[in-house]
Amino acid sequence: MNLFYDIEVYPFDAFVVFKDIDKNSKLFHDKNGFEGLAEFIKGHTLIGYNNYFYDDHILAKMLQGWSAAQLKELNDLIIGGNRPKAYNYPFKSLDTFQQIDVAMPGLKKIEGNMGKMILESSVPFDLPRPMKRDEYKEAVAYCAYDVDMT
């Protein structure tokens, strides 16, 4: 079965949202060490947007139990252009970004071209403290929307 997914990383919070074709969702968070994540994705094909260049690297470290702070360091390296070398991850994934034209549009541009709402989060990715409950809910909703658009 295919699972669509997206990851968000903040200095004190990191999580991944999965959805199946019927939009059933599952959230894994660093606060519980991503407990159950490996078992949940076992045998599934993961589908993301630009995941070959970002999410797959982060997900591999989530599976190793990295903390939000460690994931944020990796996140910043990747965003800064220092992408880790790809290796054989313990999961199978497909990247919908690879099916897009060479202009390399971002997911938000594609959403706009499809006439979809462009949802942004007001929670800054460099938030210098743990998220408040309402910020966490907003960030998860933002992540889940990106999974839907993938």
Q: What is each residue range found by the language model?
A:
Residues 14, 39, 123-124:
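Proteins with a high burden of low-complexity, intrinsically disordered sequence enriched in S/T/G/P/A and R
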Residues 47, 101, 106-150:
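Acidic, Mg2+-coordinating catalytic module of metal-dependent nucleases/exonucleases
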Residues 8, 35, 39, 73, ...:
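Glutamate identity and glutamate-enriched acidic tracts
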Residues 2, 20-109:
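Conserved DEDDh/DEDDy metal-dependent 3′-5′ exonuclease domain
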Residues 1-20:
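Gly/Thr-rich phosphate-binding beta-strand-loop-beta motif of the actin/hexokinase/Hsp70
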Residues 6, 95, 146:
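Acidic active-site catalytic centers that drive phospho-/nucleotidyl reactions
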